[in-house]
Amino acid sequence: MDRGSPRGFTVIETMLFLAVSGLLIMGILIGSGGAINAQRYKDATNSLLSYFQSQYDRAANVQNLRDTDLGCATGGTELTVSDTAISRGTTDCVIIGRLLVASDSGESISARTVYASSDLSNSFSESGAQLGGDVEVIKNSGLFIDDDLGESRDYAPEWNTRLVQAGTSDPDAWQILIIRSPASSSIRTYISDDTGLSLVDLVDASNEGQRLICLDSRGLVMSGNRGVVFSAGSTGGSGVKLVGDGQC
């Protein structure tokens, strides 16, 4: 019995198949794109955390990267260029910490070396005991940075993210001083929203509180911003931790 030729797909059936297939493919692409962006934002926040923690390591374990023709005198406020080579560790100044300053746009952080130039012999008794507290010793240590000859490096948050104030999209500008006491070697952290504050004025108990630093995803994710938090009185990298959605 002749059953006729096999029946193919109609135009409508073909169009429906293509439409459904297109929607499925689009959904897969959107889903994978969202997952990729979420991972990028996670990487950006983890990178920011690692950056801050590395600055504590730089303050505790000094890296003297200066050129051998740079020197410094007791009581000085800048590095000087010498005609002869000066061995590292033989000048009258010491590297004492790191100063981090966020740009007004929130798109970069500059890190500079902090030096101390004062003779601290009066900070100790004849028996070697420390006289006065760390804050007093730090304030009297002749703090300075040298924008011309000192080390300065910039860090930009990854994937076009930027630093913003908590709960807003406004850029967040601040300065963070991570400093090692030249007397006790204890690490202290001072944070201020006033980027024009001098180093001496920055060393104040009012600047040792907890500080939240948020990272704007700039559309990478639709959930809330994430960031890091400096614990009050942070003395090391462990005092900086990640914070999740809802805290920024």
Q: Could you describe each region identified by the protein language model?
A:
Residues 13, 22, 36-39, 87-133:
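Generic hydrophobic segment detector
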Residues 104-248:
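Intrinsically disordered, low-complexity regions enriched in Pro/Ser/Thr/Gly and acidic residues
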Residues 59-106:
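Short, glycine/small-hydrophobic-rich surface segments
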Residues 36-70:
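Membrane-proximal N-terminal amphipathic helix
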Residues 2-41, 45:
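N-terminal single-pass transmembrane signal-anchor helix
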Residues 16, 26, 49, 75-84, ...:
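Localized chelating/binding microdomains
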Residues 9, 77-79, 163:
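Aromatic-residue hotspot detector
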